[in-house]
Structure formats: C-alpha cells, structure tokens
From Swiss-Prot:
It holds the Pfam family SecY. Its main location: endoplasmic reticulum. Belongs to the SecY/SEC61-alpha family. This is Protein transport protein SEC61 subunit alpha. GO terms for biological process: misfolded protein transport; post-translational protein targeting to membrane, translocation; protein transport; retrograde protein transport, ER to cytosol; SRP-dependent cotranslational protein targeting to membrane, translocation. The keyword Membrane applies. InterPro entries: SecY/SEC61-alpha, SecY_CS, SecY_dom_sf, Translocon_Sec61/SecY_plug_dom.
Length: 479
C-alpha cells in the first residue's frame, strides 16, 4: 500500500509497547486450559488487592451499575476493569466502520498495526481514566493525598490495566481459550450472582436483621416464621435485598439465552474439489455473539462518567445539564442521573419505575436495541465475517452453496448475514432490557455476557477438547 495513512502514526510506538509473542506452533488444548485458568487466577487476585494510598472510596461511584459488566472492583487494582480495552475497541470499530481509517484486515502488517493502535489507545485511556479518578477525589481530596500518593495511585491503576491488556492478548493469540474481556466479565458476573444468592452475611433493616443471600434468607424465613406462606412471599419479593424472584429471573434468562443460541440457518455446502456428502455453514441468530451489548455498555459507561464528572464541576452549565444531572437517592450516597441524556439511557431501577416514566423507558429501549443493531452490523465488516469475507473464504476452500453457481455465494450471503447481525444484535439488546426490568441478580448486560461467554467456552470444549455435545442437545440440536 502506498501513501501516508493515519494508522501509520502508531508505528513509532510499536517497539515500546509490551507485547505477547504469538506461539510458533498450535498450543495443545490441555495447555490452553491451564493458561486460561492461570490468567483467571491473576485476574481474581488483582480484584482483591486494594490500592495502596487511598484515603477513602466512599464517594459516589460513576460506574456503580456497570462494574459487573466491566469486570471492575472498586478500590482495588481492578478499579478500571476492562473499560480501557472495550472503549478502545469501540472507538476503532467506529473509525474503521465509517472509513475514517482504512485497514486491510487480510494484510498482516495492516492487521498488526491496527492491533498496536488499539493497545496504545487502551493504555492512554487507562492513564486518562486513572488521572481523572484520582484528581476528582474518588480516593480522597488530592490536596490531602499529596503529589506522591496521587502519582502512585495513577501508576498502580495504569500498571494493572496494562496487565489486563496483556492477559487478554495472551488468550487471543492462542495460548488460552476465548478472550480475556469475555472471561473476566463472565467470572465477575458469576461471582456476584453466586454471592447474592448464597451470601451468609447479614444486614439491618426496618424488619430487623436479614440475611443478604436470597437462598439463605428464604430458608431462614421459612425456619423462623410461623406463617410459612407469608415467609415464602417475603423471600420472593423483599425489597432492597436480593430475593428469590430475582434469582429465578436470572436462571430463566440463562436458559432463554442458551435456547436462542441454537437458532440458526443452515446453508448446504458442497466442495468443488472432491466428491462427498454435503456439509453445512450455520448462520446463527447471535451472529456477532455478545459484542453488540458489550460495545453499547462501553458507550453508555463513558457517557455516565463524563456527565457525572462535568456535573460535579459545573452543575449550572446548560450543556452539562443537557448531558445529565445527578442526585443521590434516599438512603444512599450513590448518585443517579435524574435528567438529561444520561437519565434516558440509564436503565429503570425496576418494572414499577419503568411504568411510571414511559417516555424514558421507550427512549431507553430504543437506544439499547438501536445501538446493538448498529454495532452488530458494523462489527461484521471489521471482524472478517461480512458476506464478502465469508464468500472469499468459500472460494479459497473450494466450497459453494449447494444449488447455486460459484459466483452467487456473495449475493446469497448478503441476503442473510446483515439481517442476522442486525436482528441478532437487537435481540440480545432486548434480552438485556428484559433483564433490567425483571430485576435479575446483576444488570442485563452482565448476565447476557456471562451466559454467552459460558456457552462459547462450552462450544470450544466440544470442538477442541472432544467433549460430548449432548449436554445442550435438548436446547439446540432440533432447531
């Protein structure tokens, strides 16, 4: 390729960026499992190590409802979670999808430069987010902490984010299974759901001391109350603490997503190079997996962060108010959007709130479904799964769609793949909205990411580990 491109600006930084060297040969499945477990353990340890030097972390949390999805744990090395990686990926997706930057993903040098640019931006975003967090007083007044402690806090956050970037790269380059982003999110979500279901800790409310875990609370109420019916009802609908209805809603969503994973269109294929039985190429409903909802959440999280920080600094500015106004709910120091753009893209607290403000609910649903559909259709263009890319793969492998000419593969795929991507993205967005309205144990986004990731790992185990596929045959084989 000739001429100067914007992407070439990152090439001078390439030698200075940490990198995971790709394996020279394919890593065995057992070794990949081992490296995946090691990566997961490193993430879990970092999630429990508190930041050194913080005076307080009791201020309002801009990422309160997104921490589970971002695999973030406040006040620890994993404060930023996967936010820098996801935000960087989202930005470069938009730049490439709108043709602001031109990348030939079939060209190895272009692909490596593109990945380097994403990594560089992720590190720069980590530096920016860490600096904003520290200087806005999330860990105590900067004047009280001092320059040395503030610098140390920023350094810790950037170092931890760099480790997360490398762990993700380690998995994606073939040493492990899947991607670090999905793995960390799924692990964080499963951990939080398990804790909310079985936590033995207690909280004090107007009704007295109650167990935090929904299952533990149910057995305690049934064992300590004479009126079993009333105790059972309370365990299902108790406010302000995890309840059994939320747990059952979470399980319902889990099985619904697994069931929908099986929806697909099978294109019959035949080889032009050899005779034999026809194979098939599946085009699934969730063609782009959980990418759309992850990018939608990254977009929303950045709007929430910017809006809250600007409102804390300039609460009377008209532009800032249009972006979002914030206030704490009764009995909590946590700020929530109560006006502006941030309010309308913030999920309703529950189904009752959704009914009380139908305009907000309608705008929120339209935003989630629309952005997921757009991100999904854009993603196929840069991930090598567009109709043109798939048709090219067919041609290289000597495959054609049975009953069609060699040259008609692109036309046939163009009729199906973009629709599957858009509809699948909107569907996963709709499931996220349903989760938020039903009040599952965790946000709709995080639950969906966890389920699709777990299912993806199951498929990897079937494909590469030779495990029996009959586990979910009842959900998908007959579809």
């Amino acid at each position: 390729m000739s001429g100067f491109r914007v992407l070439d600006l990152v090439k001078p930084f390439s030698p200075f960026l940490p990198e995971v060297i790709a394996p020279e040969r394919k890593v065995q499945f057992q070794q990949r499992v081992m490296w995946t477990i090691i990566t997961l353990l490193i993430f879990l340890v970092m999630s429990e190590i508190p930041l050194y030097g913080i005076a307080s972390s009791d201020s309002s949390d801009p990422l309160f409802w997104l921490r589970m999805m971002l695999a973030s744990n406040r006040g620890t090395l994993m404060e930023l979670g996967i936010s820098p990686i996801v935000s960087s990926g989202m930005l470069f997706q938009l730049l490439q999808g709108t043709k602001i930057i031109h990348v030939d993903m079939q060209n190895k040098n272009d692909r490596e430069t593109f990945q380097t640019a994403q990594k560089l931006l992720a590190i720069l975003l980590a530096v920016g987010q860490a600096t904003v967090y520290v200087l806005t007083g999330m860990y105590g007044p900067p004047s009280s902490l001092g320059v040395g402690v503030c610098s140390l806090l920023i350094l810790q956050l950037v170092f931890a984010s760099t480790i997360v970037i490398l762990l993700d790269e380690l998995l994606q380059k073939g040493y492990g299974l899947g991607s670090g982003v999905s793995l960390f999110t799924a692990t964080n979500t499963c951990e939080q759901v398990f804790w909310k279901a079985f936590a033995p800790t207690t909280s004090t409310s107007a009704k007295g001391t109650e167990f935090d875990g929904a299952v533990v609370a149910m057995f305690h109420l049934l064992g300590s109350r004479k009126d079993k019916k009333r105790a059972l009802i309370e365990s299902f609908y108790r406010p302000n603490l995890p309840n059994m209805f939320q747990l059952l809603a979470t399980l319902l969503v889990f099985f619904a997503v697994v069931y929908l994973q099986g929806f697909r269109i099978e294109l019959p294929m035949k080889s032009t190079r050899q005779r034999g039985p026809y194979g098939s190429y599946p085009i699934r409903l969730f063609y782009t997996s959980n990418i759309p909802i992850m990018l939608e959440s990254a977009l929303a999280s950045n709007i929430f962060i910017i809006s809250q920080l600007l409102f804390m600094r300039w609460p009377n500015n008209l532009f800032v108010k249009l972006l979002g106004t914030w206030d704490a709910r009764a009995g909590s120091s946590q700020l929530y959007a109560n006006g502006g753009l941030a309010y309308y893209i913030q999920p309703p607290f529950n189904f009752t709130d959704a009914l009380l403000d139908p305009i907000k609910t309608t705008i929120y649903i339209a935003f989630v479904l629309g952005s997921c559909a757009v991100f999904s259709t854009t993603w196929i263009e840069i991930s090598g799964t567009s109709p043109r890319d798939v048709a090219k793969q067919f041609k290289e492998q000597g495959l054609v769609i049975a009953g069609h000419r060699d040259t008609s593969a692109y036309k046939e795929l163009k009729k199906i793949i973009p629709i599957a991507a858009a509809f699948g993205g909107a569907t996963i967005g709709a499931l996220s909205v349903v989760c938020d309205l039903m009040g599952t144990l965790g946000s709709g986004t995080s639950i969906l990411l966890a389920v699709t990731t777990i299912y993806g790992y199951y498929e990897l185990a079937v494909k590469e580990g030779g495990f029996n596929k009959s586990i979910v045959s009842g959900f998908s084989d007959g579809i």
